[in-house]
Amino acid sequence: MGLRAKFLTVLVAGILWVGCSGGSTEDAYIEQAGVIHQNALTIDGHVEIPANYATREVDPGRDNDFQVDLPKLLAGEMDSIFLVIDPGRTASDTEDIASMQAGTIRGLEAIHRLAEEMYPNEFEIAYSADDIERIVGSGKLAASIGIENGLMIGHEIVHIETYFNLGGRYMALPHEIHSEPVDIEMFPGEEFDEAGLDSLHQQIIAEMNRLGMVVDVSHLSRTAMLEAVNLSRAPVIASNSAIRKLRDHSWNLDDDQLVALRDSGGVVQVVAFGALLTEDAALRRREYNNIRGAFGMIPGQQPEELGAEPYEDYMGRMEALDERYPDATVADFVDHVDYAIRAIGIDHVGISSDFDGGGGIPGWNHAGEGLNVTIELVRRGYSEVDIEKLWGGNLLRVLREVESVALRLGES
């Protein structure tokens, strides 16, 4: 149950996305969703952090340009987040791996700095499912830790225990067995390596099971994903994936993968990443980047900085882009949630944003807008119990089951 200061009453009207229809039925949905959202223990299963996180440059306690910060989390009634460290996607030699290892440690230290030095009254690191519930019950935000890419382990399995002891509670397997596209806007027919698991990957899974660290199968090749699910002695998660039947992308999960995930006892955390939800959103993202490139814009540069005439040209192109390739919506996102529930049951589906890692859609584009997801779920007939499972209950169950497997392995 969320125990943050309750801002929903005054914020509901302000955060609803454009196009929400009026009328008594819609008002009833909004009112019902507000109550459910307040009462649920809400967990965002995947939020990425930048390399300079928890510094003067990137202060998570202040309202800033990032999609997740303390004011937005409070406004959105979020109770818990998985802060995810992405140490990099490729490593060609031992020097690269050492650099990735150092980056992972810096990320872990940054999250500890956030919770233990900068904002100890607002955040606390959660090391278990029970910790999440205890921390939320105390009125703080529970900060759990995920790791995007296990490639930095190299051939030294001992690093996994180091990351676990510092709070890492899920980790994606190394990216050399990932279905890693050249860009996120790939389309049907653009397939990538179907590499499977080797003995090192098997050792990594065994060690994660022993420790009680959740195996994250998002973005693996199809072959590697199915092998990982079968090898793991504990349930697995896909921390930021969507549904391949609705958007044919190799990062998304097909029906066989969904069933395998369910049979492991795991959860797919459906991600609000537009290019993984609709093809139009992928085309939009590609064209958007092309437009910015044509104006020589650097990351973070605002169009107002272009000057009067280029600004008008830029805005004209953006208006045309809006008409040609509409962005994915909260309804599109919940379409993927719906499909997963029909395919494998509501006990195996969760929610993640991938905020500050490319995620976010109109209506749920920062941590302050999570209520809009709950409104759409209510609109489609989901009950309070259903919504509580989707927003965090199912993920908590997986964490507990993974912890239990580790205890049993330790006793054997």
Model-flagged regions — what are they?
Residues M1-L8:
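Bacterial N-terminal signal peptides that target proteins for export
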Residues C20-E194, R244, D248-S412:
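N-terminal hydrophobic targeting/anchoring segments and the immediately downstream early-domain regions
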Residues Q203-V217, T223-E227, Q257-D263:
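Substrate-binding cleft of carbohydrate-active enzyme catalytic domains
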Residues N240:
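Conserved active-site aspartate in kinases
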Residues G2, A234, I243-R244, G368:
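Charged catalytic cores and adjacent phosphate/nucleic-acid-binding surfaces used
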Residues V182-M186, L197, A224-A228:
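Active-site-adjacent beta->alpha loops and helix N-cap segments on the catalytic face
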Residues T9-G19:
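Bacterial N-terminal signal peptides
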Residues G196-M208, A228-V236:
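Alpha-helix-loop-beta-strand connector modules within alpha/beta enzyme cores
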